[in-house]
Amino acid sequence: MSEMIVLPHKVTVKVPLASRVDAERCLQVLAPDRELKEELVQRNLFVDDNYLVVNYSCSSARMTRVTVNSLFENLYLIIDTMHELSSL
Protein backbone atom coordinates (compact mmCIF):
# COMPACT_ATOMS: atom_id res chain seq x y z
CA MET A 1 0.00 0.00 0.00
CA SER A 2 1.38 3.43 -0.93
CA GLU A 3 2.02 5.95 1.81
CA MET A 4 0.05 9.21 1.74
CA ILE A 5 2.34 12.26 1.54
CA VAL A 6 1.25 15.32 3.53
CA LEU A 7 1.23 18.57 1.54
CA PRO A 8 1.20 21.26 4.27
CA HIS A 9 2.58 24.21 2.28
CA LYS A 10 -0.22 26.04 0.49
CA VAL A 11 -0.17 29.10 -1.73
CA THR A 12 -2.69 30.83 -3.98
CA VAL A 13 -1.50 32.93 -6.92
CA LYS A 14 -4.10 35.28 -8.39
CA VAL A 15 -2.93 36.79 -11.70
CA PRO A 16 -4.85 39.78 -13.10
CA LEU A 17 -5.13 39.81 -16.88
CA ALA A 18 -6.61 42.30 -19.33
CA SER A 19 -9.77 40.24 -19.86
CA ARG A 20 -11.52 37.01 -18.99
CA VAL A 21 -10.61 35.74 -22.48
CA ASP A 22 -6.91 36.27 -21.74
CA ALA A 23 -7.26 34.48 -18.39
CA GLU A 24 -8.99 31.55 -20.11
CA ARG A 25 -6.25 31.39 -22.76
CA CYS A 26 -3.59 31.18 -20.06
CA LEU A 27 -5.57 28.44 -18.36
CA GLN A 28 -5.87 26.49 -21.62
CA VAL A 29 -2.12 26.67 -22.16
CA LEU A 30 -1.18 25.70 -18.59
CA ALA A 31 -3.83 23.05 -17.88
CA PRO A 32 -2.44 20.19 -20.02
CA ASP A 33 0.99 20.34 -18.35
CA ARG A 34 1.23 18.05 -15.36
CA GLU A 35 3.46 18.77 -12.39
CA LEU A 36 6.81 16.97 -12.64
CA LYS A 37 6.49 15.56 -9.13
CA GLU A 38 2.76 15.01 -8.75
CA GLU A 39 3.23 13.17 -5.47
CA LEU A 40 4.82 16.32 -3.99
CA VAL A 41 2.68 19.04 -5.64
CA GLN A 42 -1.06 19.40 -6.20
CA ARG A 43 -2.33 22.18 -8.45
CA ASN A 44 -5.80 23.59 -9.08
CA LEU A 45 -6.28 26.14 -11.90
CA PHE A 46 -9.40 28.18 -12.56
CA VAL A 47 -10.58 31.53 -13.91
CA ASP A 48 -12.39 34.09 -11.76
CA ASP A 49 -13.54 37.03 -13.89
CA ASN A 50 -10.32 38.36 -15.47
CA TYR A 51 -8.05 36.53 -13.00
CA LEU A 52 -6.18 33.29 -13.47
CA VAL A 53 -6.15 31.64 -10.05
CA VAL A 54 -3.72 28.86 -9.18
CA ASN A 55 -3.85 26.98 -5.87
CA TYR A 56 -0.86 24.87 -4.90
CA SER A 57 -0.34 22.40 -2.08
CA CYS A 58 3.28 21.30 -1.75
CA SER A 59 5.36 19.00 0.42
CA SER A 60 7.97 21.61 1.44
CA ALA A 61 8.77 25.30 1.33
CA ARG A 62 11.48 24.58 -1.25
CA MET A 63 9.06 22.70 -3.50
CA THR A 64 6.59 25.59 -3.17
CA ARG A 65 9.26 28.10 -4.23
CA VAL A 66 10.38 26.02 -7.21
CA THR A 67 6.78 25.42 -8.31
CA VAL A 68 5.74 29.08 -8.08
CA ASN A 69 8.92 30.19 -9.89
CA SER A 70 8.10 27.77 -12.71
CA LEU A 71 4.55 29.13 -12.89
CA PHE A 72 5.84 32.70 -13.22
CA GLU A 73 8.32 31.70 -15.93
CA ASN A 74 5.54 29.98 -17.88
CA LEU A 75 3.16 32.90 -17.42
CA TYR A 76 5.80 35.34 -18.64
CA LEU A 77 6.26 33.31 -21.82
CA ILE A 78 2.50 32.87 -22.37
CA ILE A 79 1.64 36.54 -21.82
CA ASP A 80 4.58 37.73 -23.92
CA THR A 81 3.48 35.42 -26.76
CA MET A 82 -0.13 36.63 -26.50
CA HIS A 83 1.10 40.22 -26.66
CA GLU A 84 3.29 39.52 -29.71
CA LEU A 85 0.48 37.70 -31.53
CA SER A 86 -2.02 40.48 -30.81
CA SER A 87 0.19 42.98 -32.65
CA LEU A 88 0.20 40.97 -35.91
UniProtKB/Swiss-Prot annotation:
UniProt keyword Nucleus present: yes
InterPro entries, A to Z: CTAG/Pcc1
Swiss-Prot/TrEMBL GO biological process terms: tRNA threonylcarbamoyladenosine metabolic process; tRNA threonylcarbamoyladenosine modification
A GO CC annotation given for this chain: chromosome, telomeric region
Intracellular or extracellular location(s): Cytoplasm; Nucleus; Chromosome, Telomere
Keyword DNA-binding: no
Any Pfam family the entry gives: Pcc1
The entry's keywords: Activator, Chromosome, Cytoplasm, Nucleus, Telomere, Transcription, Transcription regulation, tRNA processing
Family (UniProt): Belongs to the CTAG/PCC1 family.
Free-text function comment from the UniProt entry: Component of the EKC/KEOPS complex that is required for the formation of a threonylcarbamoyl group on adenosine at position 37 (t(6)A37) in tRNAs that read codons beginning with adenine. The complex is probably involved in the transfer of the threonylcarbamoyl moiety of threonylcarbamoyl-AMP (TC-AMP) to the N6 group of A37. SPAC4H3.13/PCC1 functions as a dimerization module for the complex. The EKC/KEOPS complex also promotes both telomere uncapping and telomere elongation. The complex is required for efficient recruitment of transcriptional coactivators.
The protein, known as: EKC/KEOPS complex subunit SPAC4H3.13
Organism field: Schizosaccharomyces pombe (strain 972 / ATCC 24843)
